[in-house]
Amino acid sequence: MAIYVAIGIRLTGVKEVLGMWIGGNESAKYWPGVLNEIKNRGVEDIMIVSVDGLTGFVDAIGAVYPQAEVQRCIVHQVRYTTKFVNYKDRKEFVKDMKAIYQSPTEELALEKLDEFDEKWGKKYASSIASWRNNWAQLSTFFKYPEEIRKIIYTTNSIENFNRGLRKVTKSKSIFPTDDALFKSIYLAMMDITKKWSGKAWNWGQTLDQLMIYFGDRISPEDLE
């Protein structure tokens, strides 16, 4: 059983939980329903979505929010990639991999990826293939300036939120029903989000950049 969480940032800079869903290893058919639920509750448009690697989720985003840009979480990608790497190689491997996603431009990142492939490709083919196959979503953040990159680069907001939820689920390992689990999770969510009164870091400059890239989709009412 898994708990799926969606967190958004309003144009006012305030974070908000958009929804939580309890399920198992969901198929690709599950995600359009989740996204349509979010849309029906009032989220009319999404500029950029930061995701991990759920099967079929990117396609579902394209169907429900066709204008949304998708950024695959770099932290999740690094974790997945290093699964295949021997311990003795890991430090050097991670250093070389970091040069890819810390490049200032996509062009330079692709050069670093080619170097990475040349050095490690024969030994860790699956790791390199993961970068190649997912590059379209891994490289989205290169389009934007630093202010926007810091927000979409990873799903850290959700990771931190989930860390708070785990304290609840670990303290009580067995729940009699899904409803009992959901109620406990909901109460934990309310406790966590009480601390979300402030705006995202450096939001004024971030909003300024968002207006440059997405201004035609933002109305004055959206900023209130």
Walk through the language-model features, giving the residues of each:
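Short acidic, glycine/Ser/Thr-rich loop/turn "cap" segments at secondary-structure junctions
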Residues: 16-20, 43-45, 78, 94-97, ...
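A generic short alpha-helical patch detector that favors 3-5-residue windows
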Residues: 23-27, 49, 70-73, 85-89, ...
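Acidic/histidine-rich catalytic cores and adjacent linkers
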Residues: 66, 99-224
